[in-house]
Regions:
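Active-site activation/catalytic loop segments of kinase-like enzymes and analogous catalytic loops
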Residues: 251-294, 311-330
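ATP-dependent phospho-/nucleotidyl transfer catalytic cores
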Residues: 27-31, 52-53, 59-63, 118-134, ...
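Long, compositionally biased intrinsically disordered regions
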Residues: 353-356
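Conserved active-site aspartate in kinases
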Residues: 241
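Small/polar glycine-rich anion-binding or flexible loop at a beta-alpha turn
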Residues: 302-312
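Conserved ATP-binding subdomain of kinase catalytic cores across diverse folds
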Residues: 25-174, 248-250, 261-262, 266-273, ...
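Juxta-kinase regulatory segment immediately upstream of eukaryotic protein kinase catalytic domains
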Residues: 1-26
Length: 369
């Protein structure tokens, strides 16, 4: 896609029902790497809005994407209103186009959408303290609980088979068989690690197929920076970045948060001796999450959360190693073995989780372990 200039941005802004002429800042806003995000505001007001160009190379069906987001946010707003909350602040609000649509296609074929800007909030890029991690957990759990009665099967898959771990395993096997760059001979321990966990990769989907755990509306990208906190109080306000909201398992969202938050190292740490899964942070997050989501979950689903932590971490490592075998085409790299370092970090975390897995189960399901 072409770079977004001020004229392109202003032309897109003019398509939305902002209530008047807009001032547009063509500098990117935030930390996101997929969509192009900008802040715009009305010329005579200080009220701000988010204007985004959707990356249609990643999200090929913007109509389905926005149908998901509109349906989920309308449901959330009704729940928040009924609970006495502030839906204008506690949920993303989609701004329609002047014709009443949820998104706009410009003359270049680019898809755009707009939201109210949620003022006086911050998002964390890393876990600063236990209290913040618990707050993020409570906010994500509340999001899950409020969507517990939403018909998940009506949602579009915005990225097909995104958390289908057996499919990720199959893609790895194809990359290994092709061995396009001849790298397989240098990573025998990592290959053996994945092969030894083929059976594990099926655990969650087997539980879903057997009817032991339910299909849910899931966020599928539950990094801590996708939760807005009140700038003054630190209270959890709103879950953002809803592009990957689609049918899934609660274990996916729980597990991805643990993968990214319950350790004290960078995702691409080259020194594996510095990689440490923090069981205490896992417990902090689990208790926060279950305090708001637990009421709508069965014992079997609670137990699946521990598996979610293991499998989302394993799956991510498989994806990194697959990309390494294929020539580093998907994930951006800053050094030759970057994806290999990423994969090794994930596998170290998996190994450490396996060592304390009984304790992980006990934490999420103390009454039925």
């Amino acid at each position: 896609m072409k770079p977004v200039t001020e004229p392109i941005l202003c032309a897109a802004a003019s398509a939305f029902d902002f209530g008047g002429p807009m001032v547009c800042d063509p500098h990117h806003y935030g930390e996101g790497h997929i969509n192009d995000t900008f802040v715009v505001w009305r010329a005579e007001h200080t009220k701000r809005f988010i204007l985004q160009r959707i990356n249609t190379a990643t999200f090929t069906d913007p109509a389905g994407l926005m149908e998901n987001i509109c349906g989920v946010t309308q449901h959330l707003r009704a729940k928040i209103q009924a609970e006495g909350g502030d839906p204008g602040r506690e949920c993303l609000n989609v701004i329609p186009t002047l014709s009443g649509a949820s998104y706009y296609i410009d003359t270049e074929g680019n898809a755009w959408r707009a939201y109210d800007f949620v003022e006086n909030t911050i998002c964390l890029q890393q876990v600063g303290c236990e209290a913040d991690f618990r707050t993020v957990a409570e906010t994500l759990g509340k999001f899950q609980n409020q969507l517990a009665d939403y018909p998940a099967s009506t949602l579009h898959e915005t990225i097909a088979r995104f958390h289908d771990t057996p499919n990720r395993y199959a893609n790895f096997e194809k990359a290994l068989a092709a061995d396009a760059l001849g790298r397989a001979k240098t990573i025998a321990p990592e290959i053996a690690f994945i092969h030894a966990r083929k059976k594990d990769s099926h655990v969650l989907l087997d539980q879903l197929t057997a009817g032991e755990i339910p299909l849910r509306v899931t966020h599928n990208d539950t990094k801590i920076n996708n939760v807005l906190l009140d700038e003054a109080t630190g209270k959890g306000i709103c879950v953002i970045d809803l592009d990957t909201v689609m049918p899934g398992l609660s274990a996916y969202d729980f597990g991805d948060s643990i993968r990214t938050g319950a350790n004290d190292c960078a995702e691409d740490e080259p020194d594996q001796s510095k990689v440490h899964f923090d069981l205490h942070l896992y417990e902090v997050f689990a208790k926060g999450y279950l305090s708001t989501a637990g009421a709508s979950m069965s014992m079997a689903e609670k137990k699946s959360l521990a598996w979610g932590a293991r499998l989302m971490t394993l799956e991510c490592g498989i994806r990194f190693l697959t990309d390494y075998l294929e020539g580093d085409h998907y994930f951006h790299i800053a050094r030759p073995d970057h994806n290999l370092d990423r994969a090794r970090t994930q596998f170290t975390l998996v190994r450490q989780m396996e060592e304390v897995f009984d304790q992980m189960l006990e934490i999420v399901c103390p009454d039925n372990h």
